[in-house]
């Protein structure tokens, strides 16, 4: 089971980290901060440049935390929040198949890892936190907090974008 959790954390965590690097640095064919901010502006976010940095850091930092199994509930919270926002603002209109099933799967994996913990091959376990930072309470806290932040972000954070804030 430990190797399965390690594989799951590495694949999902590094996938998120790669997407964060796309947003922050333009690596791997990403748009960088300017392209990401322009995309967020097209979705109606009021502070697209700031959001580009926050989302990029959430994906990069959360992905690396998840991959290493360190502060797993925090990693899960960051990643679930990003996925719920993506579902609500980008892929929901496309429906389940060909729409939001990928983002929902990633969010579910992150919540599940908050519940199970990162496993014995993790930094949380190495420092003795794995048992304290896992369980249904942590998974519930991750999911409920991510829902609250996502609702706030998608409702109060959208309106007329400050286009002059987009870098470049």
Label each region the model flagged:
Residues 1-28, 49, 71-168:
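Extended, low-polarity transmembrane helix blocks
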Residues 18-19, 40, 63:
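Generic signal for short, ordered secondary-structure residues
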């Amino acid at each position: 089971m430990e190797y399965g959790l390690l594989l799951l954390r590495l694949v999902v965590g590094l996938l998120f980290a790669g997407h964060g690097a796309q947003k922050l640095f333009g690596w791997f064919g990403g748009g960088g901060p300017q392209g990401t901010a322009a995309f967020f502006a097209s979705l109606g976010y009021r502070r697209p440049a700031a959001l580009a940095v926050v989302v990029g850091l959430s994906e990069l930092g959360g992905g690396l935390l998840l991959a290493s199994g360190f502060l797993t509930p925090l990693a899960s919270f960051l990643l679930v929040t990003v996925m719920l926002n993506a579902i609500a603002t980008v892929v929901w209109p496309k429906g389940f198949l060909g729409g939001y099933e990928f983002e929902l799967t990633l969010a579910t994996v992150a919540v599940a890892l908050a519940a199970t913990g990162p496993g014995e091959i993790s930094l949380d376990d190495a420092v003795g936190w794995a048992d304290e930072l896992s369980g249904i309470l942590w998974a519930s806290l991750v999911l409920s907090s991510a829902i609250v932040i996502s609702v706030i972000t998608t409702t109060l954070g959208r309106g007329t974008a400050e286009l002059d804030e987009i870098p470049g």
